[in-house]
């Protein structure tokens, strides 16, 4: 499906609010994109239209007719019907064409927005913690009201009217010519982007079903840590601590650098992660506090202490491993994508569609990943880390935090008192926004358009897509209140919601709502997340804290770069081995994760053949998304550098301004936001300076 539909759930803000009238449409029309040979003879139709409207419209007529013909099917009508449609719907008058554009834009906002609301309702009980789920909830969540939209718009010929009158563009053309387009030209490109492929609704529904099943699988992938034993058999985690993979496991590991028993805990968590990736984890211990588990010996014993609120689970002692369920979900995504590939001539693989949605070529993204991974700064950063740790680095130190260590329990105490419920966080949003620099009026305007829901999963942001609807912030609140991990995620998701709200309600063309790609949504959310401790009233950062923040940004970005590279290589392997079983996919994933680790991480962290790079749950729920996080960190760093040293009011003003640049090319967006294209150089330069000043 189109780029617009791919990124629909994460569309954020765009430029020109209601106080800023749109500029005249003065930029050159996007250059015609070569179209494959039409399945029917178009010569007669073109000749008649040129004779009717004049040679001045020849280029538009030829391109529009070819665009329609390429996706016209026998059920749409015969040659006569095709010609009649083109004769009736081609618009030579600029005013009529403008009216069509506005009709289409308004229609798509309403269709997209209402379908999102229906989908949000059908998935409500699987995504929001409303109590025990009912059997029907999973079935309702599998319903996708938008699955038939594009199919129906083709069947009704609405899609063909857009393709006949507005240019369809390829990524290559947008990269080549897009810098000269004005916003109307970009909006036209986004309009036809809805219809660049014609995927049958049953295939779209199958892809959605795979996504829902994977989401539910991961949402239930919790480890009850009080029932996980260390290598010495000791129970080190408190009763009731339930961690979802991978987010909470990773964050718990990061939080234990200041703990007296932290190293033992970290080694235990790392072993859990390895068991998950290799699928040697006993299936009986997943989300089960009735069994104790030693992940080192991989032995299951009867639970000695069971929490009062423990869910009903098996008490049967069984060491049988999880039967490659993790990779069955990846394979299901792949099989659904393969069917869609046949109907995606512009981007004929899931990989190609991911980069088409990002509007950055795969080769360029891979080059950025490798640039980070091969930088010699890693050795210097690891050397400082080793000195701070006072021990030899271990593989789990890939998640080391250079920042000033804080015992997580101290932060938990603050957040649990302040946010006993999701509603308490919602009521505090105006204060949070004012502390970030937004005016009281702006803070209230934004908070009035955001609802907070208790999440079953780790948390996420769901923006509205129709003016009049509201964005939803999903955050996980355990019994006893929101812990720091949940708060940290909630602040991140709030950043998404603020972007989404600006986008939807203040935009010249709703077709340009959002940002160039999902990496930018993550980048702007990271700007909020980086200020989470300040929002709790903790001391402002010193020069040393700022230096360590830079090292953190580099170390974290480099960590995700490896995981992203593993995922890209896994999907390339899948396309080269389309008949692979889940077991074969597991073996390939483990092999690739080890190869990337051994090449880029073993020199600084040791751990030959470590598989930790395969732990990210995104690879199960949202395939080919991880590279966006790397881009997001780079973009966030560039934007943060742009607002560095400015007061909070300036931060808020600049945050809104860059959010409102719209869904244009990534480099064009970044150039207008910071004066530089997307690059790793600012981060690497700052990292080098931070390392030098710390010596």
Please give the residue ranges for each predicted region.
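C-terminal, non-catalytic "cap/extension" segments appended to globular domains
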Residues: 32-305, 333-406, 578-695
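Sec-dependent signal peptide recognition
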Residues: 2-9
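Bacterial signal peptide processing site
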Residues: 16-18
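Post-HExxH zinc-binding segment in Zn-dependent metallohydrolases
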Residues: 502-558, 632
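Active-site recognition of the HExxH zinc-binding catalytic motif
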Residues: 473-504, 525-526
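Auxiliary, metal-adjacent structural segments of Zn-dependent hydrolase domains
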Residues: 405-469
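Short, glycine/acidic-rich hinge or "gate" loops at secondary-structure transitions
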Residues: 286-291, 441-447, 506-520, 538-545, ...
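C-terminal motif of bacterial Sec signal peptides marking the signal peptidase cleavage site
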Residues: 12-14
């Amino acid at each position: 499906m189109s780029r617009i539909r791919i990124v629909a759930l994460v569309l954020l803000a765009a430029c020109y609010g209601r106080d800023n009238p749109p500029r005249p449409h003065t930029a050159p029309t996007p250059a015609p994109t070569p179209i494959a040979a039409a399945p029917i003879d178009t010569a007669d139709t073109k000749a008649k239209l040129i004779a009717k409207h004049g040679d001045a419209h020849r280029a538009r007529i030829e391109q529009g007719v070819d665009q329609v013909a390429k996706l016209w099917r026998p059920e749409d009508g015969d040659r006569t019907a095709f010609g009649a449609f083109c004769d009736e719907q081609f618009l030579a008058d600029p005013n009529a064409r403008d009216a069509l554009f506005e009709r289409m834009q308004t229609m798509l906002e309403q269709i997209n927005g209402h379908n999102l609301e229906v989908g949000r309702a059908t998935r409500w009980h699987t995504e929001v913690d409303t109590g025990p789920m009912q059997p029907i909830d999973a079935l309702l969540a599998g319903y996708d009201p938008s699955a038939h939209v594009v199919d129906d718009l083709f069947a009704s010929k609405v899609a063909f009217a857009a393709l006949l009158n507005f240019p369809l563009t390829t990524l290559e053309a947008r990269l080549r010519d897009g810098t000269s387009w004005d916003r109307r030209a970009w909006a036209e490109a986004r309009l036809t982007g809805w219809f660049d492929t014609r995927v049958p609704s049953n295939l779209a529904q199958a892809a959605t079903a795979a996504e829902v099943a994977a989401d539910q699988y991961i949402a239930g992938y919790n480890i009850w840590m009080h029932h996980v034993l260390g290598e010495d058999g000791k129970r080190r985690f408190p009763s009731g601590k339930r961690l979802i993979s991978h987010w909470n496991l990773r964050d718990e590991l990061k939080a234990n650098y200041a703990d007296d028993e932290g190293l033992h805990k970290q080694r235990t968590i790392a072993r859990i992660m390895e068991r998950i990736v290799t699928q040697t984890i006993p299936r009986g211990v997943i989300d089960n506090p009735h069994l104790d588990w030693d992940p080192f010996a991989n032995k299951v014993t009867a639970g000695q202490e069971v929490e009062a609120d423990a869910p009903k689970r098996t008490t049967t002692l069984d060491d049988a491993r999880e039967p490659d369920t993790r990779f069955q979900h990846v394979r299901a995504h792949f099989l659904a994508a393969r069917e869609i590939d046949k109907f995606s001539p512009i981007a004929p693989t899931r990989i190609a569609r991911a980069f088409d949605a990002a509007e950055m070529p795969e080769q360029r993204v891979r080059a950025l990943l490798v640039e980070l991974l091969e930088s010699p700064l890693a050795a210097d950063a690891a050397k400082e880390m080793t000195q701070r740790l006072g021990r030899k680095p271990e593989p789990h130190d890939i998640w080391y935090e250079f920042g000033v260590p804080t015992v997580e329990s101290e932060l938990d105490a603050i957040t649990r008192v302040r946010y006993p419920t999701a509603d308490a966080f919602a009521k505090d949003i105006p204060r949070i926004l004012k502390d970030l620099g937004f005016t009281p009026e702006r803070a209230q305007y934004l908070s009035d358009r955001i609802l907070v829901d208790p999440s079953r999963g780790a948390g996420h942001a769901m923006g509205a897509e129709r003016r009049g609807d509201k964005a939803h912030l999903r955050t996980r609140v355990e019994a006893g209140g929101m812990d720091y991990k949940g708060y940290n995620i909630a602040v991140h998701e709030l950043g998404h919601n603020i972007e989404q709200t600006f986008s939807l309600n203040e935009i010249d063309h709703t077709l340009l709502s959002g940002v160039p790609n999902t990496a930018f949504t993550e980048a702007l959310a990271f700007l909020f997340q980086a200020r989470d401790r300040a929002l709790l009233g903790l001391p402002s950062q010193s020069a040393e804290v700022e230096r360590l923040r830079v090292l953190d940004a580099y170390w974290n970005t480099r960590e995700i770069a490896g995981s992203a590279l593993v995922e890209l290589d896994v999907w390339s392997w899948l396309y080269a081995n389309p008949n692979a079983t889940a077991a074969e996919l597991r073996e390939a994933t483990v092999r690739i994760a080890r190869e990337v680790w051994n090449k880029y991480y073993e020199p600084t962290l040791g751990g030959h053949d470590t598989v930790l790079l395969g732990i990210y749950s995104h690879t199960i729920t949202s395939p080919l998304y991880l590279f966006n996080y790397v881009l997001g960190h780079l973009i966030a760093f560039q934007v943060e550098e742009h607002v560095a040293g400015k007061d909070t009011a300036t931060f808020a003003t600049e945050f809104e301004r860059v959010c409102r640049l719209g869904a244009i090319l990534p480099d064009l967006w970044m150039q207008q936001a910071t004066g530089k294209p997307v690059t790793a150089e600012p981060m690497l330069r700052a990292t080098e300076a931070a390392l030098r000043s710390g010596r």
